[in-house]
């Protein structure tokens, strides 16, 4: 076998008949498969051992030669070579056809490739191939045309008239002769001449023909090879025949299809030998043609060939296509050994980097390692005994297992894996039971809960794999989400509740006003019952030696609560003391108002001091983000573990729980409901008198009930007892929100109707009172709709992610700096008065392109090519800078990827991105993963005049990325100038808007229904909207330039996501949009060898033009094209990647005609052929590096303790530098 990691590229082409024969090990002459008595393969049949190799290892068919010592001998009795039986998966055979047949892919595809080469219509081709018409091949000296079609009758008449002077035939033979007559060079030259004058349809057709003919010419494929004389037979183990219990056989459909071809071929041979009448021979040839068509692509033409039970047989094409095809089922989605799956359960005692693995599962997963260890320790004499010992589960096996799994990470994966945090590495810990135990804090990244979710576990085997799992994938390192760089491991539920309860304050609790010398004394007082967790007390500030208090504060006493003193124990030693839940406290330390002088009376202070809010979920998240920023990964994961333990302990001790008595009744509810009923009655009366329309009545009724519900909700909130457990749970962010509470204690309100509107009758009861039957029934509509929407949305969102990944999978950070001189000017994105994305968010983690100047003083704030962190970005915003020119993926010059400088910071680590990072895939996952949170519906601006439907949510995202014409398209102006008039045109039901530019004046007619976005006298730039709605980006790219289009697409995507409260980094959207705009359509080839109308990558286009200019020619001109992501995926340079995405047969047909060469640049094509992917440590730059030895080699190179020490040291240095 060839080593896959050695070759550089892979090429596909048409196979000539000689090529097919050279692959073959022999001709299959009979349709037989295996003998029904002996079950041995028949000679010359589809499973013949002489052709395909022996069925048993090192054994010929007749049994004369057995054992490996006869390797390579061909048996003189049965003619079978003695070798391994696995050659039956590699050796091919062939069938010699008695008459040529056409390959259906090249005849039937759209456009028909054969039709283009011969310049004939597919319909006339079909008539010739399936023996309905004759075609004139050589008219001789008759007045007929070449390629003229003749019916049977016309043919006979012409034969009588002209005798044998002309040549006309039917079937694939005729096509083959015509194809052999095609002179490629001459045709190409003629077409190039024609193109100079051709217009319209004629030009399009000429360009298409030229494209195909040029492809044949360049690739060295012969057009006649589209007609086959010989058919390859794939190896028998790839189309197996197996015996089922009960003696019946199950066989692959391909065997049936091959049998039909062989039967018809043999019958045709016999008819030809007998000199049968031509009509019988023709019929047999047609049947042979149809049999071969069915073998290659069943069902492409006519009715598919069916097997038992009218099921269409699966042909060769079907073996490749779709989710169950070879590409997606076996090449991109392999199942792997050393894996298991089980239900997950919570493991609150685990450390952040650990997971619990059931004993039996671990024993099975690590079996080989345990066996080796048993033999090594002389606990078993050989491997066989070791295996027996394991199967018996002897006691000493468990001790060995404990030692084996030390230092060996395992991977846990939860489907659906929506982003890279769906697979993380953990250190296994053996647990009893049969469920995998998961650390509660990683649930958010996996989107896991413990209601029966399952997870898969995998064991990295090689040293490299273990090192990568440990260094790159350990759960404790994944604290930030790749999509927005915010912490993803935030405490939730019990942990939040525990810490909330811990940091609460209450007036007048036991021990209020006591003053302690340090935290230890506080803990002692708590344990002895002198103080309560919620008691407000004083602590001598100077007891906190490492905390950053001011000198003045250190002389005083700090007023805090017992719980907060405990909470601060888990924080890093020199982190500010946290006394109030504000960002100011996190960054700048405790405000002065919480300190009293040493002699001052603390009770007087506490009398007037308001209670400080406890720490809620959002605040805990802010703490984690700050700790991560200052102290880096290791300290943060320690803090998270401590916070988890503290939270669980405190929520257990607090005894917080929910009882039905905690749901209080609202006294004012009956009055509010009564008032609403009266108001609705009034509205109905107005409608009956004809004062208002039905629509207005409906809107007002809905409004009335919504107001009533809001009123009840507000009163509930006002009457909340802060110590009510339900209100504590909702307020802390642990579980539930205000609307849950309203439904429990207030009223449920209006329900959704099946048609998407609202029902006018509200559900007045709440769940505490109980619903009536009618109310219950009304609620079911909404509930059912919610379920179906979610299911549909999940599928849609998953498909969007798949397309995004496919289009961007080859975007990898390839180099440090591309040296571009262009940048992207960014400013805050606004929609009307609403801020969509502030400037700060757009600057963090990006490089500057130009110096940033202070708008007031003009001094340089930030130099060019500087990576902006949070502080720098904040400084720029505070200085009042409106827009900044940054390095952007849009303007990056790197071929096949991006450079470090244009990409900036890696969101998931907070450091500059490394060469080799697969940023395309990360971008696709970051956009696709929140897809399920977007709404499915298109919003309607209800009843507002001139408001058109705005598509939002998931449909809008798909519309943008697929570059479709938007719903509610806006009219844009093509000139810059002033709006001189807006006139009504009642006859056409339109308005005419006139724009006067510098050179010309344009008038645009817009429908009455659309809202006009401009007024007379406005100045307008080209590409701006005249009406409301979304701009069609394909129009924009024509009117403006690529940059404007890229910017528009970026801001549109951000609008959708940010409106739904999902933050995504700009750079992810930039990567996707750049992939949509990476092609150029060549308009005029100049002196290059490009054909007009070709789609080329920008990089290739520049390269060809550079060559043309160097050799003194005229460069080609082209215009940028915006492709939707599906189209862009199929237009990629890699045919393997495109074929495994969609439209497999079309992609392969086209690639083989062009003799395409796949350079194996992206990730997907390398996975398909099993080569190491060129990202991360698989980059060529890293692969060729020799390991350097620095100092002595440590034995425990992968030991966790060592790595933790190194990381702590490194984090310490980082922390120091950050603090300076």
UniProtKB/Swiss-Prot annotation:
Its cofactor is Mg(2+); Zn(2+). SMART domains: RPOLA_N (SM00663). It holds the Pfam family RNA_pol_Rpb1_2. Zn(2+) 2 binds at residues 818, 892, 899, 902. GO terms for cellular component: DNA-directed RNA polymerase complex. GO terms for biological process: DNA-templated transcription. Its EC number is 2.7.7.6. InterPro entries: DNA-dir_RpoC_beta_prime, DNA-dir_RpoC_beta_prime_bact, RNA_pol_asu, RNA_pol_N, RNA_pol_Rpb1_1, RNA_pol_Rpb1_3, RNA_pol_Rpb1_3_sf, RNA_pol_Rpb1_4. It is an enzyme of class 2 (transferase). Keywords: DNA-directed RNA polymerase, Magnesium, Metal-binding, Nucleotidyltransferase, Transcription, Transferase, Zinc. Binds 1 Mg(2+) ion per subunit. Binds 2 Zn(2+) ions per subunit. DNA-dependent RNA polymerase catalyzes the transcription of DNA into RNA using the four ribonucleoside triphosphates as substrates. HAMAP family: RNApol_bact_RpoC. Belongs to the RNA polymerase beta' chain family. The RNAP catalytic core consists of 2 alpha, 1 beta, 1 beta' and 1 omega subunit. When a sigma factor is associated with the core the holoenzyme is formed, which can initiate transcription. This is DNA-directed RNA polymerase subunit beta'. It comes from Lacticaseibacillus casei (strain BL23). The gene is rpoC.
